[in-house]
């Protein structure tokens, strides 16, 4: 039995396999000393497998040429000559169990982390698309200026993403965001303002793929028009500086630009109840980095918000609300490029 240690130095791998050992036969067996009995080469994981008389690194069953079946032999009638058996104990031979090759290639730790972090970046930017009600509340008190703060903590779960021949592990992330801003009334119906924000997403890749982080520092401007009949239009432009890294990737920096527009109308009901249908459309662009294409997406949301106002004895107003939203996010085919993929 023999042990092989493999170091990835960027050599090209053709057709999903590379031959490590060539033999003319024999019963020699080989196994890897690498952790988990596998090697990450470019986008995929590779395992040691026997192909005929040779031993190869392969990323799936389809990459290995199957051994042709042995033609059947017609047995002859045996001639048995009884003899006294001689029992000679043999030293047991322990053959290491070869790993079972996957049916389709599995993403390498590096590829899974980079693709998943790219998703996490877009999620974090879109998660901070604050609607007018989240940012300003029910602005109908006629005040000339407002200062506001918004803290959001959420947990998101993404299923596996198809990447062509393979798929990601999927991931969960905990998002913590803080935004602080101020605005002033230009007219009775128009308000202009700005804000700064800081966010972090702690990303947990499913399976044995480890963890990652995405951080964001952002600054933005907005203009909100609120008509007397309850119709409002809210426009936001925002710049974000993103930082992403994981257990297996170095820290990378990105620039993200977002334009968002929201339209809605508030209907006043009895006893300080209000109902507000609303729609939002946003565009986001995240810059490229080394082997990563730039990423652009269109985010759309339609929703309904129901609120109830309470006037407190100290002059404060309390307004709990509930909202339901349908959200879609469409992006073009942004790619991450690897050798051997």
Stretches found by the model and what they are:
Residues 5-188, 254:
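Outer-membrane translocation/initiation segment of Type V secreted surface proteins
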